[in-house]
């Protein structure tokens, strides 16, 4: 379904930043960017990821799993409140996708973070198979989340491969 710009403005006007579900769904406002909101949401996820790197990996994983569970609800509810499924302003799914992607970094150097960001954004925007299948066939809050989860898992796999099996020094 194509949404005319005027209708997107109407949908955004239905957001209430005092509603914690809406605030999280739009990535603390990063998804309200008039240009490339998904990219802005992915960038906004990085400082939160950095704070999460101080957690033991088990707790980091638990935070991501809780983020997925909460995200299914908050994305569904926010989309319902806005009257648009998977509105571009809803970027919590990008947060989760980035956190999954960045779990696979061999080191926390900024070059690896940038590589993870670029790989995730390319996959999230391009939506190759199987990402596209999930995007088209799963609906509701899970439908909003799942394509970014799959893009994050694939991005993490690519980063892991590059970091552990590619000739040394490529990104160092």
UniProtKB/Swiss-Prot annotation:
Chief location category: membrane
Annotated source species: Escherichia coli (strain K12)
Cofactor: Mg(2+)
Name of the protein: Phosphatidylglycerophosphatase A
Ranges of the Cytoplasmic topological domain: 1-31, 75-141
EC number(s) from the headed UniProt entry: 3.1.3.27
GO terms of molecular function: lipid phosphatase activity; metal ion binding; phosphatidylglycerophosphatase activity
TM region(s), chain numbering: 32-52, 54-74, 142-162
Disruption phenotype: Displays 7-10 fold higher levels of phosphatidylglycerophosphate (PGP) than wild-type. Simultaneous deletion of pgpA and pgpB leads to 40 times higher PGP levels compared to wild-type, while simultaneous deletion of pgpA and pgpC leads to almost 100 times higher PGP levels. Lethal when combined with the deletion of both pgpB and pgpC.
Entries under InterPro entries matching the protein: PgpA (IPR026037), PgpA-like_sf (IPR036681), YutG/PgpA (IPR007686)
GO cellular component, one term: plasma membrane
